[in-house]
Amino acid sequence: MSIHPVVLVGGGPGAWDLITVRGMRALQEAEVIVADHLGPTAQLDKLCDVDAKELIDVSKIPYRAQVAQERINEILIEHAQAGRRVVRLKGGDPYVFGRGFEELTALTAAGLPVEVIPGVTSAVAVPALAGTPVTHRGVVHAFTVVSGHLPPGHPKSLVDWAALAQSGATLSVIMGVKNAAAIAAALIDASLSPPHPRTHHSRRLPRWRASIPVRVG
């Protein structure tokens, strides 16, 4: 029995046609697709013959349905060890807050080969499609991607908001809608001088509804 690499595919920022060509080919070759709502699953039929695949839903809906990461790892291992061609379809890029490295670690510990196909992260794609560059010559020469799922001051947060406020870089905050007010306050408290331009993109593509230019302060 042949063992095939488990392929971790970055599905891009939401729209089905923003996945990479290599990612699409991996889906077409797969026998099993392990996907959650963060990838382009709603229009998966535009990328491959869904009826010819086993599609396993491992929902990751914030504050609602969740499949534990440990169980996702087990599913990937079980099907790969059975000799099936397995794709793990993820949103954005597998390694940008996608827990892709956790899956790679579990798979390699089980003695299984892994291939990673990068994806376009929403941290750059969504601002770009809304007309907001994350860098601009003579204005900003750096950008930082930050998780906002924990508020500033949370004991488990690893983000130094004070340092970011002083960095001069564009901040692209992912999963930050719930804590947007607290994040803005923390940046101001750390001397990010208001008014400071900020654009709020409330959803990933194609489901985001509006881009709202606002100011911190």
Predicted features along the sequence, with ranges:
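Class I SAM-dependent methyltransferase SAM-binding "motif I" and its flanking Rossmann-like core
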Residues: 4, 91-167, 216
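A generic local secondary-structure boundary/capping motif
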Residues: 22-24, 77, 131-135, 159-163, ...
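Class I S-adenosyl-L-methionine
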Residues: 1-16, 21-120
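Short, charged, surface-exposed secondary-structure boundary motifs
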Residues: 45, 64-70, 125-127, 146, ...
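Short hydrophobic/aromatic-enriched beta-strand-loop microsegments
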Residues: 52-59, 113-115, 134-144, 191-201
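Short acidic, glycine/serine/threonine-rich loops at helix termini
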Residues: 20-21, 46, 99-101, 127-129, ...
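A generic structural signal for secondary-structure junctions
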Residues: 48-49, 131, 150, 188
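A contiguous loop/helix-start segment that scaffolds small-molecule binding in enzyme catalytic cores
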Residues: 3-8, 82-86, 140-142, 147-217
